C-alpha cells in the first residue's frame, strides 16, 4: 500500500525528467523516498531520480515497493495538473495507480516491473572536473549552441569551464571563469556530447536551479540537477561522442 | 436600421460560441436583445445565444430585424479586436453589416436569411438532474478526459456529479459532491457524450463563468453558460452517444 | 578594428529589420554610426537602417569600415540574446565578426562585401502626403487588412489617412483624421501595396514606436520607423502595385 501526496510541480518534474529518456519506468518507493533510474533505448544516457521522503507532503508506505509505470501516460495527464495543486498517488493493489488532484481521480494500469527493461547499474566514474552553476545559464548556453551544431565540447581547465560548438562558418563559446561559477575545482577535462540529449535534459530545469557537472576526458559526464527548491534530485549521465579529428 | 455598441469581449464571445457549430447563422435583433440559434451540420448539437439589450452599451433598432451573417468572417476579423475595445455594429440596408472598432470600419455582405439552414425549434427536455458549477472546473475536467478517450459519461446521483472517461489501460473520474458544487439537486441521470463537441463548447468559457448542466438518462444534455460577467447567455444542447455495452 | 557595445534590443531590431528583405548585407561602421541598406531579391522593397553612434553604449572604430554579414545567422543567434543583455560586436581582422553577450562568444565568418549584391542608390522621391502615427496602430490595421486581401490601398486627402482592403464579400477601411494622427499635412495621394511586405516590415515595430509615412500617387511609399526609444531609424521604401481597375 502506497499513499503519498506531493505538489503538482514535483510530479511534473519527476515525470518530465524520466520521459526525456524512456516511456516506461520502474518507480521504487523506498523508506528514504522515491527512486527511479533508467537508460534510453540507444544506451547513450541514464537518468537517476531521487525524491527524499521529506519532499513529500505525506509519505505513507507500509513496505518498500516497486511499481512499473507507463510514464508517457502520467506525463500526458500531468499537463492537466497545476504546479500548485496537491497530487495524491495511491497504489492499493498490484494492478493500479491512482493519481488524485482537485476533483479528479485518474487510474492507470500498472506494468509488471519485470516486463520493463532491466535497470542499469549506476557506473562508478572518476571525473576530475567539478563545476557548479545556475541551470538557467547552462540551458541558455545549450540553446545557443544548438543553433550552430548538433554536438558540443565541454572543456574544463584552470581558466574555467567552456561549452563550445562549431558550425561550417561560425562557432560559439560559452565561458565561465572560477569567479563566475558557484563552485569550481579547476580540474582538467574535455569531452564531446550530443546537443539533442542535453536539450532534452535541460527541459526539467530553469533559472535558479542548481546544476553540478562532473566532467572527464572522453568519458561520460554527470549532470546533477537540484530542482523544485532542492526537493528533487535528477541526475543524467551522458556518454561522450567520439571526436573524429 | 440597427445600430448597437458592445465590448469587444462580448462580440468575441458571441462569435466564438456560434462558430463552434456553424459558419453561417441568422442573428435576430429583438426588442429584448440579440438572439441566435443554430444546429451543426451533423445534427448533433444546438447553440442558443441570448444577449439582453442591457448588456450592450447602446442598443438602437427601429424594428425587430433578422440578418444572415457569415460568422467565420466575423470570427476572423474579431481576432483583430481587443476585448476592451468598443465595437459598433450597423445595418443600414439589407445588404451590408458594418463593424466599427477603433479607427477601423469593416464591411461584410449579409446573406439572405432564407438561404441559411432553417433554425431549429428549441426542444422541450425533461431533465431530472441540475448541476451548477464553475465553468473553468468543467473545462479542466473535459481537457483531462480528452487525454484518455473521445467520449465521456456524465453521471449524477445522491453522491454528486461525475464525469468519467475510459481508455484501454487508464480511466479518469472527475467527481464533485453537493458541497463542492454551487447548486445541485441530486437528481439521478447518466448519459454519454462526445468529447470533441464538449471541448469546442468550453472554448467560450473560463474560470469564474457559471455553468448550469441539465442532465437526463440517455438523453440530450443542456449546458448553459453565463459569460462576460453574466452579460451573455450561451446554451448548448448536445445529443447523447449510444453506449455499446 | 571595430569594437562596439549595444543593447540586445537594438541588435535584435537591426537584424530583424534587415532579414525582412535580405539574408546577406553590407554593414557600414561610419564615423556617425552604423548604416546599412539593401533591396530584396524581387526589387520591390528597400530597407535603410541607421543607428547613430550615440545609440551605442560604446562605439569604437579606428577608421570607417564596411563588413559583409550573413544576417540570417546573426538573426538566429540573436534569439538567444535577451533585450536587456549588452552585446559587444568586435571585428579585429577582415575575416571574423565576434558577438559577445553574457558568458557567450559567438564567431561568424565575414563575407567579402564585394560578393554581396550591389547596394541600391536611395531614390529621390517627391511624395506629397506626410502622415505621422503610432506604429502599433499601423500594425493592427495591416493585421486586420491581411484577413481580407493580399493588397491594400493607402489614401491621403483633406479628410485624413486611410488604409483600405477589399475582399470578395467584405472590405475594411482604417481611417484616421488629422486630429487622430500625430502629424498630418493633408496632402493628396493614393497607391496600392502588397500586404505581405507591409506585414514583414511591421515585425520590427510595436505600440509606442513612431511611424512616418511619405505617400504619393502610384508611387513608392516611404515608411520611416523610429524604434527602440528613437535610438534606431529603420526606413522601408516599397514599390506600388498597379491597380488593374
Swiss-Prot record, chains A, B, C:
PROSITE patterns: PCNA_1. Transmembrane segments: none annotated. InterPro entries: DNA_clamp_sf, Pr_cel_nuc_antig, Pr_cel_nuc_antig_C, Pr_cel_nuc_antig_CS, Pr_cel_nuc_antig_N. GO terms for molecular function: DNA binding; DNA polymerase processivity factor activity. Coiled coil: none annotated. It comes from the Archaea. One of its GO terms (biological process) is leading strand elongation. Pfam families: PCNA_C, PCNA_N. Keywords: DNA replication, DNA-binding. CDD domains: PCNA (cd00577). Homotrimer. The subunits circularize to form a toroid; DNA passes through its center. Replication factor C (RFC) is required to load the toroid on the DNA. Sliding clamp subunit that acts as a moving platform for DNA processing. Responsible for tethering the catalytic subunit of DNA polymerase and other proteins to DNA during high-speed replication. This is DNA polymerase sliding clamp. The gene is pcn.
